[in-house]
Amino acid sequence: RLCIPYIIPC
């Protein structure tokens, strides 16, 4: 799954 720090947590 996509993870983007501060936007989409892992």
From Swiss-Prot:
Localization: Secreted
Q: List the disulfide bonds.
A: 3-10
Q: In which tissues is it expressed?
A: Expressed by the skin glands.
Has UniProt tagged this entry with the keyword Disulfide bond? yes
What is one GO biological process annotated to this record?
positive regulation of leukocyte proliferation
- From the UniProt record, which GO molecular function terms apply? growth factor activity
Is-annotated flag, keyword Glycoprotein?
no
Major place of localization? secreted
Q: Which UniProt keywords apply?
A: Amphibian defense peptide, Disulfide bond, Growth factor, Secreted, Vasoactive, Vasodilator
Q: Which GO terms describe its cellular component?
A: extracellular region
Q: What does this protein do?
A: Induces mouse splenocyte proliferation and guinea pig smooth muscle contraction through binding to CCK-BR.
Name by which UniProt lists this protein:
Signiferin-1
Species this protein is from: Crinia deserticola
